């Protein structure tokens, strides 16, 4: 029964793997709910800041913030948001494929691309393909912290404000629902005039500025862009946990199928061995 012993060992090994994937599935499900709550909580803030900035812009049409001005620089920036860890299906592969397409599109027009990586997977990929990585942020954990994101992202925001790059793109995995996530590459800068339209209300707005309107608008638009990046990272984290939960569930189900198949093989092997022994006993008795 050497073969039977080997099969039992395989069954035990797969059962242990199944326990691990099941535990990871449950942990991911718990983290997913928290990540979704953070993602939803961030949306009203970004919308409120955008609306206030839009009202201020309408009240001061003579001032146009650098983030809303186009320029002719032959360079662009892209912020690539991925995960720090794997075991989340094809999520990172999909977003990096979209990034590759965007990089080729920009480089084909002679545009020099500067990259900021958020997440280990994106950083490793950009280094492998020889992209120009000007800053990165890794080890964010399960909760996005704006103070960890501001430093790396500010490199591209400052470059745009100074006219060194003509656009900033943001690539991440957009959360649709638990079973569906979508890889996107969105233009972050310049901000479009449609994007900065204020919500129509039935009353007028009158502000008292301290120290002045330009300073307030400058600060608000920077906060708005930062909130968009935070929102993207929050959505990416919610997508990560959803994708990991689905991937670990699939792994657990597959492990169960493998165990059933191995048990069937073991039972057939054991039955064949017993049949052989009985045949030998009968043959021996007949010979006597």
UniProtKB/Swiss-Prot annotation:
Localization, UniProt: Cell inner membrane
SUPFAM superfamilies, A to Z: ATP synthase (F1-ATPase), gamma subunit
Keywords: ATP synthesis, Cell inner membrane, Cell membrane, CF(1), Hydrogen ion transport, Ion transport, Membrane, Transport
Topology in the lipid bilayer: Peripheral membrane protein
Ribonucleoprotein in keyword set: no
An example Gene Ontology CC term for this record: proton-transporting ATP synthase complex
One Gene Ontology molecular-function label: ATP binding
Subunit record text: F-type ATPases have 2 components, CF(1) - the catalytic core - and CF(0) - the membrane proton channel. CF(1) has five subunits: alpha(3), beta(3), gamma(1), delta(1), epsilon(1). CF(0) has three main subunits: a, b and c.
Family: Belongs to the ATPase gamma chain family.
Protein name: ATP synthase gamma chain
Organism: Acidovorax ebreus (strain TPSY) (Diaphorobacter sp. (strain TPSY))
């Amino acid at each position: 029964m050497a073969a039977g012993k080997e099969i039992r060992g395989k069954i035990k090994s797969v059962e242990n793997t199944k326990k691990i994937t099941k535990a990871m599935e449950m942990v991911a499900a718990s983290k997913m709910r928290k990540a979704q709550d953070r993602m939803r909580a961030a949306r009203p803030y970004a919308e409120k800041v955008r609306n206030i900035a839009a009202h201020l812009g309408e009240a001061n049409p003579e001032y146009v913030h650098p983030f809303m001005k186009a320029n002719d620089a032959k360079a662009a920036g892209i912020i690539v948001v991925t995960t720090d860890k794997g075991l989340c299906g094809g999520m990172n592969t999909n977003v990096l494929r979209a990034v590759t397409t965007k990089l080729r599109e920009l480089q084909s027009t002679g545009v020099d691309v500067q990259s900021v990586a958020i997440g280990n997977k994106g950083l490793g990929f950009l280094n492998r393909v020889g992209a120009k990585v000007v800053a990165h942020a890794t080890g964010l954990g399960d909760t996005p912290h704006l103070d960890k994101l501001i430093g790396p992202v500010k490199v591209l925001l400052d470059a745009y404000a100074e006219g060194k790059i003509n656009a900033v793109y943001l690539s991440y995995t957009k959360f649709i629902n638990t079973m569906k996530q979508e890889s996107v590459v969105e233009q972050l800068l310049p901000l479009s005039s449609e994007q900065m339209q204020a919500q129509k209300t039935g009353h007028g707005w009158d502000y008292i500025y301290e120290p002045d309107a330009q300073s307030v608008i400058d600060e608000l638009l920077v906060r708005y862009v930062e909130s968009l990046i935070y929102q993207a990272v929050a959505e990416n984290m919610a997508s990560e946990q959803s994708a990991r939960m689905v991937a670990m569930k699939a792994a657990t189900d597959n492990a169960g199928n493998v165990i059933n198949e191995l048990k069937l093989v073991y039972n057939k092997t054991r039955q064949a061995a017993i049949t052989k022994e009985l045949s030998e006993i009968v043959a021996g008795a007949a010979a006597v």
